[in-house]
């Protein structure tokens, strides 16, 4: 979260999509509001008072960030909905009068959204600081105190890692059998695959995630990235075998590299490469505060489903997953195939 929230839509949405952070923020900030349709909501006048801004200021932001604010809970009430709201708000100080025919209301999420946009409000600046602290606390608590291996909390991680290990062996065997060269070829060709998928070699990836020398980089990769690496390793191993058999001899490293470059360009892999780059770049910036500069163009806001995947009730540490009898039974069946 290095960027100013007022300047980055993705940074704002990464907070607003994190329901665990929103729950804690709503509890700690105690902003009040009126209970309506399952949410605490606030009128425009209440938001004006909260952030100590003018009506002209809030109208300017409602106009310039209309789509964003509406997607996060801002709505305009008319007719029956407005009548119902006025009935619920009766006796509260909503400051909008009984003759109002349209009324803009903000959910708590939309109130935070407005606070992340306002540059001329000191209360909004203070709120942003408090919210960022809450987000960091929630992230640490729900990820077990660190995010280096947050990828492993995904219930799909173990299976992806298990399969990737098998395909890795297939790939190294193909390098042995069908490609000339010394022991350095394993690292060199692995880096070619990494660069094909996420435009970084192993050393660059390790530096960006600030991994220790003992850390294995594939243990920090998301399941979708591991699965794509598996596809590349399996497919390239096959291409090496076919090309070597057709040649009647081992491939030179130049020939093998050309095959990888051709493999990378196949239209079949384009959507999967884009997905892997987007998820790696977006998740690492959000969860690990790690920026993949070569993938910056792929960064998007992390969707709500990803917060459930890595921080939700179903997410578990690797140790917890490995102690689950059902998980162990699945891996026993896979191993026995």
Regions found by a protein language model. Give the residues of each.
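Short Lys/Arg-enriched helix C-cap and helix-to-coil transition segments
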Residues: 69-89
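Positively charged, phosphate-engaging catalytic surfaces used for nucleic-acid and nucleotide handling
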Residues: 1-9, 117-337
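The alpha-helix within a helix-turn-helix
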Residues: 48
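A short, Lys/Arg-enriched interface patch at domain edges and termini
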Residues: 88-130
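DNA major-groove recognition helix of helix-turn-helix
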Residues: 62
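N-terminal, Lys/Arg-enriched amphipathic/low-complexity engagement segments
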Residues: 1-30
